[in-house]
């Protein structure tokens, strides 16, 4: 009886391993299909492509300080940040907030639905790890900065920092001053919520926070 039980346990474990490998391969195919190709053309979307090295270093630094300070040290998922957020929620009564890395955000924005389910978060984490195994950090940052949603004007959406710069400031992203860079980074949290036309005070408060971080924190890049 023990031998039969042991045999079945081994079979079940092998089946689980096979299912996991198959699922990981499927996710890998989705990631490769999305990120090994050029940007697709989307109707009613303004998107200007820049290479990573064309973006101002101050802008990249602000982005990393606000969205993912451990970007160059993790492998797609920041487990330390997840534990820190959970600890703060459970023991310090802090608001439960997201702990998604830039890689996870890129996966979510490019491939996944907005559903806040456990299964989607698991998919997001696995695909972020696959993304980082497949591409270097500069590519991931470049892709994120070229595709992230920053504004809406009627039926037209503006994706990427370069198009956001043209929309909000009517200038090339390389010509932005620090406050304008901080404004674009601030808008990542919610272009509607921080809309400069409707909520200037709300936006200003967040911009000041980002400028303070940029001035006082150790540079990441």
Where are each of the predicted segments found?
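Juxtamembrane regions of bacterial inner-membrane/periplasmic proteins
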Residues: 1-221
